[in-house]
């Protein structure tokens, strides 16, 4: 049974013993945000860096600024969107996407660490990350950008205070600290919710769809553990007015789980899915079809890539 207060005290002590001057990689998800807040309690020099990769949702940067301010986090926000998106050009393989993003993250952090004089990199890696990335004797299911995307030789000492926690435990500690509860968001961001090549046009489509899914899902009394749209490289025939269309397809993923290691597709109120579909096809002209993913984990992973 996890004791949040003890875990926080132990983590602060661990950080103080292992980090003299460090840089913390904050993706904006629950894991790295929790680590940023815990690290701010340590009596050591830590700079929390949030990178605008260009692969974020519409309100991510605003939310992070508010958390940095509310919890006195020594934070910095860097705009590196052009760099990330340019490196993903013509890349369609999901593993390659993750590794490119991971390597680019490390490059940016090493540069910032050098400027800051840091010798350590703190990351919000948790147990499912290194298990799925082939930790121990397990096969790699998929590389997580903060595990499988790391270069073999890195100029920073890696420190991972949360690596033995599971998702439900992260949420428990976050609640104890009064952090706003947010659904999990992958480190590689929207890049792995676009099947195929990532482009600015596709990112803009997916951001609009994400806003709709998150707003309509907020009306549910019992929200799924995770809920998001995926942009598919599939065009289908449709009708708009009396005109034929040949538009793109959005898949909706609602998943229920306790720890992120296994889960089942959610069965939300049908009217919510109907509203999501109607709004997406009405408000996003590039989309003319919405489908619902009814696959559990396993055999599928939560994210499509």
Curated annotation (Swiss-Prot):
Enzyme class: ligase
Entry keywords, A to Z: ATP-binding, GMP biosynthesis, Ligase, Nucleotide-binding, Purine biosynthesis
Assigned GO CC terms: cytosol
Biochemical pathway: Purine metabolism; GMP biosynthesis; GMP from XMP (L-Gln route): step 1/1
Domain GMPS ATP-PPase intervals: 1-186
Entry annotated with the keyword DNA repair: no
Binding residue positions for ATP: 27-33
Gene Ontology molecular-function annotations: ATP binding; GMP synthase activity
Catalysis: reaction(s): XMP + L-glutamine + ATP + H2O = GMP + L-glutamate + AMP + diphosphate + 2 H(+)
Matching InterPro entries: GMP_synth_C (IPR001674), GMP_synthase_B (IPR026598), GMPS_ATP_PPase_dom (IPR025777), Rossmann-like_a/b/a_fold (IPR014729)
Presence of the UniProt keyword S-adenosyl-L-methionine in the record: no
SUPFAM superfamilies (alphabetical): Adenine nucleotide alpha hydrolases-like, GMP synthetase C-terminal dimerisation domain
EC number: 6.3.5.2
Pfam families on file: GMP_synt_C
Subunit structure, interactors included: Heterodimer composed of a glutamine amidotransferase subunit (A) and a GMP-binding subunit (B).
Role noted for this protein: Catalyzes the synthesis of GMP from XMP.
HAMAP family cross-referenced by the UniProt entry: GMP_synthase_B (MF_00345)
Cited NCBIfam families: guaA_Cterm
Protein name (database record): GMP synthase [glutamine-hydrolyzing] subunit B
Source organism: Picrophilus torridus (strain ATCC 700027 / DSM 9790 / JCM 10055 / NBRC 100828 / KAW 2/3)
Gene name of the record: guaAB
């Amino acid at each position: 049974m996890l004791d949040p207060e003890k875990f926080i005290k132990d983590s602060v002590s661990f950080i103080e013993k292992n980090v003299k001057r460090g840089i913390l990689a904050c993706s904006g998800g629950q894991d790295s945000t929790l680590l940023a807040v815990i690290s701010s309690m340590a009596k050591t020099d830590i700079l929390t860096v949030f990178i605008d990769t260009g692969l974020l949702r519409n309100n991510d940067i605003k939310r992070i600024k508010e958390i940095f301010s509310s919890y006195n986090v020594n934070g910095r926000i860097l705009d590196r969107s052009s760099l990330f998106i340019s490196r993903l050009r013509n890349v369609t393989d999901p593993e390659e996407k993750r590794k490119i993003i991971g390597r680019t993250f490390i490059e940016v952090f090493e540069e910032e660490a050098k400027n800051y004089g840091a010798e350590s990199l703190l990351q919000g890696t948790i147990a499912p990350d290194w298990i799925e990335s082939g930790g121990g004797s397990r096969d790699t299911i998929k590389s997580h950008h903060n595990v499988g995307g790391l270069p073999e030789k890195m100029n920073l000492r890696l420190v991972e205070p949360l690596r033995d926690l599971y998702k439900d435990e992260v949420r428990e500690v976050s609640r104890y600290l009064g952090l706003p509860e947010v659904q999990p968001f992958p480190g590689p961001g929207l890049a792995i919710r676009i099947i195929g090549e990532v482009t600015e046009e596709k990112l803009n489509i997916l951001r609009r769809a994400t806003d709709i899914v998150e707003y309509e899902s907020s009306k549910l009394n019992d929200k799924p553990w995770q809920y998001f749209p995926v942009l598919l490289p599939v065009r289908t025939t449709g009708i708009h007015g009396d005109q034929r269309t040949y538009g793109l397809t959005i898949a909706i993923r609602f998943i229920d789980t306790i720890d992120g290691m296994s889960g089942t597709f959610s069965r939300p109120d049908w009217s919510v899915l109907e509203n999501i579909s109607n709004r997406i096809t009405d408000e996003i002209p590039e989309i003319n079809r919405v489908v619902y993913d009814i696959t559990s984990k396993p055999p599928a992973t939560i994210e499509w890539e």
